[in-house]
Amino acid sequence: MPADIMEKNSSSPVAATPASVNTTPDKPKTASEHRKSSKPIMEKRRRARINESLSQLKTLILDALKKDSSRHSKLEKADILEMTVKHLRNLQRAQMTAALSTDPSVLGKYRAGFSECMNEVTRFLSTCEGVNTEVRTRLLGHLANCMTQINAMTYPGQPHPALQAPPPPPPGPGGPQHAPFAPPPPLVPIPGGAAPPPGGAPCKLGSPAGEAAKVFGGFQVVPAPDGQFAFLIPNGAFAHSGPVIPVYTSNSGTSVGPNAVSPSSGPSLTADSMWRPWRN
């Protein structure tokens, strides 16, 4: 009985058919499946590239800093990156100093460019809705701090702006040098009986009040009720950067400066040769 069953099974055409004929071919892998399968290989290549670049960077930075490579054979990756950042910053400062020594306008151009970039970032952050408020505040604060440091930068050999005294204005043609001082108030009282300063003819005004107020050399002379006179200096007289020389009058009616000079001590100045700041 078992022999008959074995013979029937062996003679069956289905049993004689190979199993590979009934199997379907493999489906092509999708893009996501291909990425998953190739991810370990890509990660291995990426790490190999990073290690190779860090090894070259280590050699370059040790040569640039003139350090013995045998003593720094076991530098960590973070140490290599920190040393590289410091070296690049020093190079940037050296290049900036060299550029400023050859062209002083480089600093102004750098400030203008940084200010323009800062304004563009501020404009973008004010219109972008997806930026976190804390991140926006920190970024703008960092840019403002950098802008303050850039504004404090000076040329090589130039003192700090806060410690630098303003240069004295150039003296007038043929006139003595005077130390700069704050301009006097617009209304300067003069004792009574004072004569108008030389160099200008009186110009009468049309109104009755203008008869009393006359203009001498660009300054309006206004008589006071107590018998004194006052010079009314126009605002345009202080528009220039030249120094203003005060004029004092004595009781004798002659105009004298802070240091009185007798007529015999030097040649008298004519109206054309006298320097007037409002004519610059």
From Swiss-Prot:
GO biological process entries: forebrain radial glial cell differentiation; negative regulation of DNA-templated transcription; negative regulation of forebrain neuron differentiation; negative regulation of glial cell proliferation; negative regulation of neuron differentiation; negative regulation of oligodendrocyte differentiation; negative regulation of pro-B cell differentiation; negative regulation of transcription by RNA polymerase II
Motif WRPW motif, residue numbers: 275-278
Domain of life where this protein originates: Eukaryota
Signal peptide segment: none
Domain bHLH residue range list: 34-91
Bias (Basic and acidic residues): 26-35
GO CC, alphabetical: nucleus
SUPFAM superfamilies noted in UniProt: HLH, helix-loop-helix DNA-binding domain (SSF47459), Orange domain-like (SSF158457)
Subcellular location field: Nucleus
Keyword Cytoplasm on entry: no
Region (Disordered): 1-44, 157-200, 254-280
Record's compositionally biased regions (Low complexity): 10-21
Gene Ontology molecular function, alphabetical: DNA-binding transcription repressor activity, RNA polymerase II-specific; E-box binding; N-box binding; protein homodimerization activity; sequence-specific DNA binding
Pfam families xrefs: Hairy_orange (PF07527), HLH (PF00010)
Disulfide bond positions: none
Orange domain: residues covered: 110-143
Residue ranges, compositional bias (Polar residues): 254-271
Keywords: DNA-binding, Nucleus, Repressor, Transcription, Transcription regulation
Primary localization: nucleus
Comp. bias regions, Pro residues: 164-174, 181-200
Oligomer status and interactors: Transcription repression requires formation of a complex with a corepressor protein of the Groucho/TLE family. Interacts with SIRT1. Interacts (via WPRW motif) with TLE1, and more weakly with TLE2. Interacts with HES6. Interacts with an FA complex, composed of FANCA, FANCF, FANCG and FANCL, but not of FANCC, nor FANCE.
Domain remark in the UniProt entry: Has a particular type of basic domain (presence of a helix-interrupting proline) that binds to the N-box (CACNAG), rather than the canonical E-box (CANNTG). The C-terminal WRPW motif is a transcriptional repression domain necessary for the interaction with Groucho/TLE family members, transcriptional corepressors recruited to specific target DNA by Hairy-related proteins.
Cited function: Transcriptional repressor of genes that require a bHLH protein for their transcription. May act as a negative regulator of myogenesis by inhibiting the functions of MYOD1 and ASH1. Binds DNA on N-box motifs: 5'-CACNAG-3' with high affinity and on E-box motifs: 5'-CANNTG-3' with low affinity. May play a role in a functional FA core complex response to DNA cross-link damage, being required for the stability and nuclear localization of FA core complex proteins, as well as for FANCD2 monoubiquitination in response to DNA damage.
Protein name per UniProt: Transcription factor HES-1
Protein source organism: Bos taurus
